[in-house]
């Protein structure tokens, strides 16, 4: 019985040893498999990361793709929209050949990015009496601390003395009627900005303009572009050239002020069709002709940038009012 008991103990011990060895071998295989799998996963992720890095590099390499995020409708649109971040305006040199003729013209376009800064300023002596008088554009600019100034509405030239004192038709300044002289032959229309800073072209009275929210306006014409439609597509119409002035606005709100020198060696002048075509090229949605001829003038910081011509008179023409860009 003792021998049997001893044998049983030995067998039990051997059994435990075999079980322990089996567990150890099984666990070791599992550990090896786990380590192997982990290595394979690590290698796979490294390969994937390498591929992702290659793809990302190809996407963000602007030089390789030659990608330009800013798109323009045409070269004129690019000329308007290319500017420094803090630039309130820019001046573009304009030159070309008249439509239907072979006359060279030159001038300037002022591009104003904030339409709320575009206002009407008047001569200190403008009024509706015989002793009213105008001022040259540079003086109007100085008196109103303007960055840019351009002649605006016409005037009644009594006795052909060019004193520029009595404005033609309604003049509205800061939402109020400044003058509204009617002689009976007014043939233009309102050219002005409303309180939403949109250029409005409409034949209406001064009172109607105030009722429709016009803040600054003069009376003149003809209208060049109305709601995107060029009014002078017929090249045989109004081909007479001289100094010209116009104002327009793009759909994005940018204001365009345009002057073309006339009756001079460097610039014969432009027609209404030319002015409409220039405004159309630069994206004007609405645009109108203003007083031109010897009145055509533009200043930058009170200095003339175009070449005003006043016939054979010694002085630059006096004006009743001007479109200005405030500081």
Annotate each predicted stretch with a short phrase.
Residues 104-109, 187-188, 241-246, 320:
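Short glycine-rich loop/turn motifs
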Residues 124-129, 205-209, 260-264:
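Short, solvent-exposed aromatic-acidic interface loops
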Residues 2-182:
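Zymogen propeptides
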Residues 115-117, 155, 206, 262-264, ...:
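Short, glycine-/Ser/Thr-/acidic-enriched flexible segments
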Residues 116, 197-199, 253, 294:
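Structural signal for glycine-centered tight turns and loop->strand junctions in beta-sheet-rich domains
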Residues 160-181, 233-285, 290, 295-327:
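Conserved, well-ordered active-site substructure
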Residues 155-236:
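Active-site-adjacent helix-turn-beta-strand microarchitecture at beta-sheet edges
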Residues 111, 147-151, 191-192, 200, ...:
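Structural recognition of the beta-strand scaffold that forms the well-ordered cores
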């Amino acid at each position: 019985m003792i021998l049997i008991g001893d044998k049983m103990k030995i067998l039990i011990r051997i059994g435990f040893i075999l079980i322990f060895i089996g567990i150890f071998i099984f666990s070791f295989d599992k550990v090896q498999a786990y380590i192997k799998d982990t290595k394979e996963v690590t290698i796979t992720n490294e390969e994937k990361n390498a591929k992702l890095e290659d793809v990302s590099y190809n996407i963000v390499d602007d030089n390789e793709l030659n990608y330009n995020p800013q798109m323009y409708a045409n070269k004129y649109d690019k000329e308007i929209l290319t500017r420094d971040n803090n630039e309130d305006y820019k001046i573009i040199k304009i030159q070309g050949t008249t439509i239907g003729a072979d006359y060279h013209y030159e001038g300037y376009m002022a591009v104003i990015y904030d339409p709320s800064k575009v206002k009407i300023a008047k001569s200190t002596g403008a009024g509706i009496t015989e002793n009213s008088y105008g001022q040259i554009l540079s003086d109007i600019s100085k008196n109103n601390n303007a960055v840019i100034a351009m002649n605006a509405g016409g005037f009644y030239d009594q006795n052909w003395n060019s004193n520029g004192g009595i404005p033609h038709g309604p003049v509205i300044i800061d939402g109020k009627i400044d003058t509204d002289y009617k002689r009976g032959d007014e043939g233009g229309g309102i050219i002005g900005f409303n309180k939403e800073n949109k250029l409005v072209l409409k034949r209406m009275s001064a009172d109607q303009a105030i009722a429709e929210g016009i803040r600054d306006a003069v009376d003149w014409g003809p209208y060049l572009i109305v709601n995107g439609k060029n009014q002078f597509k017929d090249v045989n119409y109004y081909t007479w050239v001289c100094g010209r002035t116009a104002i327009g606005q793009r759909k994005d709100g940018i204001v365009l002020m345009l002057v073309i020198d006339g009756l001079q060696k460097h610039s014969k002048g432009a027609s209404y069709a030319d002015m409409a075509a220039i405004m159309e090229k630069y994206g004007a949605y609405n645009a109108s002709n203003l007083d031109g001829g010897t009145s055509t003038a533009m200043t930058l910081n009170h200095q003339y940038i175009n070449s005003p011509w006043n016939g054979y008179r010694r002085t630059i023409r006096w004006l009743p009012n001007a479109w200005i860009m405030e500081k």
